[in-house]
């Protein structure tokens, strides 16, 4: 008797329920060997005051099955709500987001008939950590977190993906010409890991020109690996230029869990109209079937779907007079796919997936390297003062008895404003005051607490402390522009 794999199903919001029903209909007709558990997430949960959009009962189902097929959800705009997608990815440590983009020319309209690439996006870190603060009346902060281990995991995954899927090249996208620490370590680790895969070509682009090339010459790319925010943006670009965002599915992979979803959003403006294209979620379900070792069913469905596309049976988003023969709605599209189960596409590539479940490499022990000597050499204290001249702030601080510690620089938004030859004025209430020992020696935490006490007694409103470290004698902090 065939073994059935338990799967957690989330119907989502907007067009989610109708495209999920269409996909489940196809899975049933194809006799996928899965057992479904349904959970409620998203908008209904937000309205019940679950700020993350998911309940404990839903988490229990996910922990039981380890696999989620999720339709798009709607995250309410404004404060107080967390993105459910980000919550699930981080909680389940789904570090890799895999987003294939393929042209189905000539059956869908695209300017790039040879587009066939996969974007591997880091899923847990970067600005999507969601750590934000309002520090003053004028200034807001969002923290970009990038770890050495996080970079190593996603970059190694990208090269392993290239090897397993017969890809020839991996391209890294970063902005390390500006963000020399966070994006710099991503690029550095990419170069190091690339040496372990001499059979795979590698290259690097700055994200801006890389995105421009992706939009105009996508056929030059094969596998792209990048950090969270950049990956989110460029995967939508790639999906759009392939012919329709509605065709793209994605996988979120971790060591113990996996989630599969469409790239597109919940599109509440067309919800309930039976016009949404279920192909994105269907392609995500195909990726899920491959992941759990049901490559036979995945191939059966993908070939039927491709034959449907070849036959010109299209939903409104990809329908065109030149290549389409019939415009159908969500339900009818699913029915047309099932009519073609067992058929093979004649022009698009035939799918033939293995019957082996995908497993994450477990022999790599990702550890935090603590061999570098870490030395505390200073501190940046951010202060809230509604004043136009950094010289006035310096005058006030320099009157204080700070012992061996001295004020080195004052900057605002990364620009050094003191000491300068001219009294440059700026509109700011957010100032970074950099302190170090006069003799350049190591400082102690007690020195910093005494410094904060002195600032407090002088009624200087400090809002943040960022300590400055050297690692093996190399500065672990950036200099302000002009410093």
Curated annotation (Swiss-Prot):
Keywords: Glyoxylate bypass, Magnesium, Manganese, Metal-binding, NADP, Oxidoreductase, Tricarboxylic acid cycle. NADP(+) binds at residues 74, 264-270, 277. The keyword Metal-binding applies. Gene3D superfamilies: 3.30.70.1570, Isopropylmalate Dehydrogenase. Pfam families: Iso_dh, Isocitrate_DH_C_bact. InterPro entries: IsoCit/isopropylmalate_DH_CS (IPR019818), Isocitrate_DH_bac-typ (IPR014273), Isocitrate_DH_TT1725_C (IPR040978), Isocitrate_DH_TT1725_C_sf (IPR046997), IsoPropMal-DH-like_dom (IPR024084). The keyword Oxidoreductase applies. The record marks 128, 175 as: Critical for catalysis. D-threo-isocitrate binds at residues 83, 85, 89, 99, 121. Mg(2+) binds at residue 232. Its cofactor is Mg(2+); Mn(2+). It is an enzyme of class 1 (oxidoreductase). One of its GO terms (molecular function) is isocitrate dehydrogenase (NAD+) activity. Homodimer. PANTHER family: DECARBOXYLATING DEHYDROGENASES-ISOCITRATE, ISOPROPYLMALATE, TARTRATE (PTHR11835), ISOPROPYLMALATE DEHYDROGENASE-LIKE DOMAIN-CONTAINING PROTEIN (PTHR11835:SF43). Catalyzes the oxidative decarboxylation of isocitrate to 2-oxoglutarate and carbon dioxide with the concomitant reduction of NADP(+). Belongs to the isocitrate and isopropylmalate dehydrogenases family. This is Isocitrate dehydrogenase [NADP]. It comes from Rickettsia felis (strain ATCC VR-1525 / URRWXCal2). The lineage of its organism: Bacteria, Pseudomonadati, Pseudomonadota, Alphaproteobacteria, Rickettsiales. The gene is icd.
């Amino acid at each position: 008797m065939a073994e059935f794999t338990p799967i957690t199903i989330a119907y989502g919001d907007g067009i989610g329920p109708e495209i999920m029903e269409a996909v489940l209909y196809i899975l049933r007709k194809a006799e996928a060997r899965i057992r479904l558990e349904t959970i409620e997430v998203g908008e209904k949960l937000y309205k019940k005051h679950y700020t993350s959009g998911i309940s404990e009962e839903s988490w229990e189902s996910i922990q039981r099955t380890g696999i989620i097929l999720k339709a798009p959800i709607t995250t309410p705009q404004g404060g107080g709500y967390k993105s459910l997608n980000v919550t699930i990815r981080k909680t389940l440590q789904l570090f890799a987001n895999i987003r294939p983009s393929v042209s189905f020319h000539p059956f869908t309209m695209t300017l790039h008939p040879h587009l066939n690439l996969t974007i591997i996006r880091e899923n847990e870190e970067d600005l999507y950590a969601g750590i934000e603060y309002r520090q003053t009346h004028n200034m807001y902060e969002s923290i970009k977190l990038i770890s050495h281990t996080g970079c190593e995991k996603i970059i190694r995954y990208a090269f392993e993906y290239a090897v397993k899927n017969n890809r020839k090249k991996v391209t890294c996208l970063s902005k390390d010409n500006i963000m020399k620490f966070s994006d710099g370590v991503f690029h550095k680790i990419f170069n190091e890991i690339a040496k372990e895969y001499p059979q795979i070509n590698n290259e690097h682009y700055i994200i801006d020109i890389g995105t421009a090339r992706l939009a105009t010459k996508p056929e030059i790319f094969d596998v792209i690996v990048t950090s969270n925010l950049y990956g989110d943006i460029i995967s939508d670009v790639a999906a759009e230029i392939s012919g329709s965002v509605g065709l793209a599915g994605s996988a979120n992979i971790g060591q113990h869990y996996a989630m599969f979803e469409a790239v597109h959003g919940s599109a509440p403006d067309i919800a309930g109209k039976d016009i949404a294209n279920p192909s994105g979620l269907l392609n995500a379900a195909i990726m899920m079937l491959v992941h759990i070792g049901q490559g036979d069913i995945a191939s059966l469905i993908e070939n039927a779907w491709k034959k449907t596309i070849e036959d010109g049976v299209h939903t409104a988003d990809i329908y065109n007079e030149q290549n389409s023969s019939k415009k159908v709605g969500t339900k009818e599209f699913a029915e047309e796919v099932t009519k073609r189960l067992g058929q093979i596409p004649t022009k698009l590539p035939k799918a033939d997936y293995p019957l082996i479940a995908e497993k994450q490499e477990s022999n790599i022990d990702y550890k935090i390297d603590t061999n570098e000597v870490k030395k505390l050499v200073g501190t940046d204290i951010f202060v809230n003062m509604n004043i136009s001249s950094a010289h006035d702030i310096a005058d006030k601080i320099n009157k204080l008895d700070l012992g061996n510690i001295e004020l080195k620089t004052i900057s605002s938004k990364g620009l050094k404003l003191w000491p300068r030859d001219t009294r440059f004025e700026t509109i700011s209430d957010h100032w970074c005051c950099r302190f170090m020992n006069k003799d350049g020696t190591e400082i102690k935490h007690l020195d910093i607490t005494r410094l904060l006490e002195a600032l407090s007694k002088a009624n200087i409103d400090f809002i943040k402390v960022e300590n400055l470290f050297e690692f093996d004698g190399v500065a672990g902090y950036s200099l302000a522009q002009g410093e």
